[in-house]
Amino acid sequence: MPDYRSKTSTHGRNMAGARALWRATGMKDDDFKKPIIAIANSFTQFVPGHVHLKDLGQLVAREIERAGGVAKEFNTIAVDDGIAMGHDGMLYSLPSREIIADSVEYMVNAHCADAIVCISNCDKITPGMLMAALRLNIPVIFVSGGPMEAGKTKLASHGLDLVDAMVIAADSSASDEKVAEYERSACPTCGSCSGMFTANSMNCLTEALGLALPGNGSTLATHSDREQLFLQAGRTIVELCKRYYGENDESVLPRNIANFKAFENAMMLDIAMGGSTNTILHLLAAAQEAEIDFDLRDIDRLSRKVPQLCKVAPNIQKYHMEDVHRAGGIFSILGSLARGGLLHTDLPTVHSRSMEEAIAKWDITQTDDEAVHHFFKAGPAGIPTQTAFSQSTRWETLDDDRENGCIRSFEHAYSKEGGLAVLYGNIALDGCVVKTAGVDESIHVFEGNAKIFESQDSAVRGILADEVKEGDIVIIRYEGPKGGPGMQEMLYPTSYLKSKGLGKACALLTDGRFSGGTSGLSIGHASPEAAAGGAIGLVQDGDKVLIDIPNRSINLLISDEELAARRVEQDKKGWKPVEQRPRKVTTALKAYALLATSADKGAVRNKAMLDGL
């Protein structure tokens, strides 16, 4: 019998009590010779990306048991960022990532599980589970709930998503009837919101890291093809267990699959597809769990050489995740990166001996396999539903146009530089990030006057009251991991700027973060954050700020002497908002803030503070 981790709780005379409890869960004598595989599900009725997951854990469990394993399912929490947004609920979103990571660790280690199937989907759930998987370093596979279908309405010539509903609601010229129609049409099915927002970005990145099956990031939640991903995940995790515990093959462990080169692959994919800036935060956090020295400087280096090969909402209106799938999904983007000489193709995945082998099999421009072509023709049905695998609609043709299609070749890239950039300067010594894919080229260099807000709430009030004018740079501070606490997303301020016609006339800088639905000159993750003594806390109303994306710089245009003098004064006052914020910070949030690092470290816990405990 292989030397399973689970033997700790299933073998030996002294474990009679534990075995009695295992038997009470349904285990038989023969089961104690099999690997115990944890299924970390994240079903909840609060989140459309998770509302359809209830029965899918048991779908995987049955396949695991057919393949020779023992499956035990548990649940994590899942916060819906869209529902939590715009009020104090958003304070809990990023901290929930740590709770999810810890809960997976607690369950897996407490019960000595041998492997994990992570059933994730939305914004903080995939990152939290990824952090746990790399922390635990036992066989793992990710299978997400899948993206939502794009919304359809006769009032728009393009597909709709959540952001469209938010923008139209803030547009005073839009009728109540139009707002209501957008609201009812924007989110028609179960699944993660239909654009290249944080959830879908992270689920795509699990493919590039080698920890998920092809199609994980792009196959619609409603499509029957997605059922096969869950079934295959169940079979694959048992095979990974056999290789690790039975054959001592350590190459299947997540830290050996998702190594430094794999993180580079994931980041290159993110840059090439113009993914959410939140992915930077989460990849940095996951790298720390894997004990990989991967940081913002690496991301900055990659951003300068990776072109943008894919554009999806919110960066362009005509394409959503269903269109990415039709164009060949993530392995077609990875294939383009490989042919451009950028991708590390020698790395293993949970499903292939190497990324090169996987691309040869799954890139629709490289294979004649009809089954693969059939798979990527899976499309939307346009029928509102909360049921997984409820339709089998197919596109008549694939989008294999690499000159003008959704996914491009190197020669026909949307832009020579990718969709994300890291900026440095005296206002953000440790860096800040911008999704350049969503920024009009006319404002890649922007000088403006600082308009200071001490919270997201006051910024929203100011924007809606027309206090922000053309040429302003909105500064929202004390919204970082420690200062918020919780590093709120700023989708409402950016959406309201857009609705006021200021999307190309203003910029926004914050030590908070942005929804994956954000576009415009929106710069987040300013590090160090204001609450940690960052220079963003020293900016005053009317100060000139220069943003220069081509040169990767952002600077407050005052002398070093003036900046130093302001720091002396701020040290005396303390690094806290000038105005009192009507914000209820609970004990749970205070505990998070106590250990939180700034965004350049992934907003993870400050482990140095814990080392002596």
From Swiss-Prot:
This is Dihydroxy-acid dehydratase. Functions in the biosynthesis of branched-chain amino acids. Catalyzes the dehydration of (2R,3R)-2,3-dihydroxy-3-methylpentanoate (2,3-dihydroxy-3-methylvalerate) into 2-oxo-3-methylpentanoate (2-oxo-3-methylvalerate) and of (2R)-2,3-dihydroxy-3-methylbutanoate (2,3-dihydroxyisovalerate) into 2-oxo-3-methylbutanoate (2-oxoisovalerate), the penultimate precursor to L-isoleucine and L-valine, respectively. The active site is at S515. GO terms for molecular function: 2 iron, 2 sulfur cluster binding; dihydroxy-acid dehydratase activity; magnesium ion binding. It catalyses: (2R)-2,3-dihydroxy-3-methylbutanoate = 3-methyl-2-oxobutanoate + H2O; (2R,3R)-2,3-dihydroxy-3-methylpentanoate = (S)-3-methyl-2-oxopentanoate + H2O. [2Fe-2S] cluster binds at C122, C193. Pathway: Amino-acid biosynthesis; L-isoleucine biosynthesis; L-isoleucine from 2-oxobutanoate: step 3/4; Amino-acid biosynthesis; L-valine biosynthesis; L-valine from pyruvate: step 3/4. The gene is ilvD. It comes from Pseudomonas fluorescens (strain Pf0-1). The modification N6-carboxylysine is found at K124. InterPro entries: Dihydro-acid_dehy_C (IPR042096), DihydroxyA_deHydtase (IPR004404), DiOHA_6PGluconate_deHydtase_CS (IPR020558), ILV_EDD_C (IPR056740), ILV_EDD_N (IPR000581), IlvD/EDD_N (IPR037237).
